[in-house]
A protein has these predicted regions:
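A conserved mid-protein helix/loop that constitutes part of the nucleotide-sugar donor-binding site
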Residues: 19-30, 194-213, 233-237, 313, ...
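Short hydrophobic beta-strand element within catalytic cores of glycosyltransferases
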Residues: 42-43, 284, 293-296, 306
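Nucleotide-sugar donor phosphate/pyrophosphate-binding loop at the beta->alpha transition
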Residues: 71-75, 110-112, 120-142
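Short His-centered aromatic/hydrophobic patch
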Residues: 91-99, 115
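Carbohydrate-associated surface elements
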Residues: 152, 173
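Active-site donor-binding acidic/aromatic loop of nucleotide-activated sugar
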Residues: 231-235, 248-257, 263, 313-314
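Acidic donor-binding loop of glycosyltransferase active sites
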Residues: 265-279, 292
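Conserved acidic donor-binding segment of nucleotide-sugar-dependent glycosyltransferases
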Residues: 308-309, 313-320, 329-335
């Protein structure tokens, strides 16, 4: 949109991690300028987003909160919004939604909230989920528009009493990619890939148990696991399970990587054995864009993306035997992995691109701006 002054938008984010929701924020900052919007960030926590993001040209304000209700920060953000004439506030987490509601009330700038996953099913700690869900529900009352990344999350908001005229379902999207998968022939070792911020709800323990079952039955499989762990304690727990299952020589832990293409080239298929708390996993879309068949679970937004038997195979959550059975079909060549990968790649191009995501978000912004 050359010749048009871009509309300034402030995204309030946590900034602690660089995982799926942060990939959405990053891609929006890269793609929204083509739609006439200039993104800035305000990070409410110290973390890795500032250094790992691709959108290094987007201004970033590091304003860590001193407490969960930091009125000083809200006043500081309100001054920033007025000084830089931000026209939209876009929030992404329960924490940022609470701050955003207060800043919107102070400035009169409309707030948009992006629901990336169900707050009530985000961690294994029930009390924390309940607290975050209550904070989010209260905070969202101040949002003019609510963006959900999947139909399952849209239904959740409707069940909570939010009206349809405020909700817009905009699926996540990722850049299109060349086909990167490794070809597989039955009889060779099958490399299963998983990319995640490893935390309990991602189900890595279930995948390890499934691999142990497969190896016990004589199947040749290994795991290429990419990404950091949420905490050192959780990392120690997972590595100990790997040792107890006798899988130490069959698992590669790479840690965080920036070149996802290089990692996808190591994989024959992609697995995400999520237990709960998924809106629409970005990493599944990225795997599909790379032409990998996907083995995942029947959790919330995942079946909206992966069509069972066409783009991959879906198992019940928290079912190592069911997951092993799905993987075994690839080991034995009972499914056409290449055809599934090609199907998923075309589906991503047609329905889940970064450009279509940005176009949808821009349309929401325009609803809130004066003509």
């Amino acid at each position: 949109m050359t010749g048009v002054t871009p509309v300034p938008v402030l995204h309030l984010i946590n900034g602690e991690f660089y995982a799926g929701a942060e990939r959405v924020q990053d891609l929006l900052a890269l793609e929204l300028p083509a739609q006439g919007f200039a993104v800035s960030f305000a990070c409410l926590k110290e973390g890795v987003f500032a250094t790992r993001r691709r959108c290094q040209d987007a201004p970033l304000h590091l304003l860590p909160m001193k407490s969960r209700v930091d009125l000083r920060l809200c006043l500081e953000l309100a001054r920033l919004v007025r000084a830089q004439n931000f026209r939209i506030l876009h929030t992404h987490t329960p924490r940022s939604a609470l701050v955003g509601r207060l800043v919107a009330a102070l400035t009169g700038v409309p707030m948009v909230h992006h629901v990336h996953s169900p707050a009530e099913r985000d961690t294994e700690q029930g009390w924390r989920n309940t607290r975050n869900a209550l904070v989010e529900k209260f905070s969202l009352r101040g949002a003019r528009r609510l963006i959900t990344v999947s139909a399952s999350l849209e239904r959740m908001l409707r069940e909570q009493g939010f009206t349809a005229n405020r909700i817009r379902c905009i699926p996540n999207g990722v850049p299109v990619s060349e086909c990167l998968r490794r070809s597989y022939q039955p009889g060779e070792e099958l490399t299963v890939g998983m990319i995640a911020l490893f935390r309990p709800r991602k189900g890595i323990e279930v995948l390890l148990q499934a691999m142990a079952q497969l190896q016990g039955a004589g199947a040749r499989v290994r795991l290429h696991a990419v990404g950091p762990f949420e905490t050192p304690e959780y990392q120690r727990s997972v590595l100990e399970l790997t040792r107890r299952l006798g899988l130490e020589s069959s698992v590669t832990w790479t840690g965080f990587r920036t070149d996802m293409g290089a990692e996808f080239r190591q994989m024959h298929l992609f697995a995400l054995p999520s237990l709960y708390g998924e809106g629409m996993p970005m990493v599944v879309l990225e795997a599909m864009a790379a032409g990998l068949p996907v083995v995942s679970t029947l959790v919330e937004g995942i079946p909206e993306v992966v069509r069972d038997g066409r783009d991959g195979l879906l198992a019940q959550a928290d079912d190592p035997t069911g997951l092993a059975a799905a993987l075994l079909r690839f080991v034995r060549g009972e499914v056409d992995a290449a055809a599934m990968g090609d199907s998923g790649r075309q589906r991503q191009r047609d329905n889940f691109s970064d450009k279509s995501m940005a176009s949808g978000v821009a349309a929401v912004y325009r609803e809130l701006l004066p003509p």
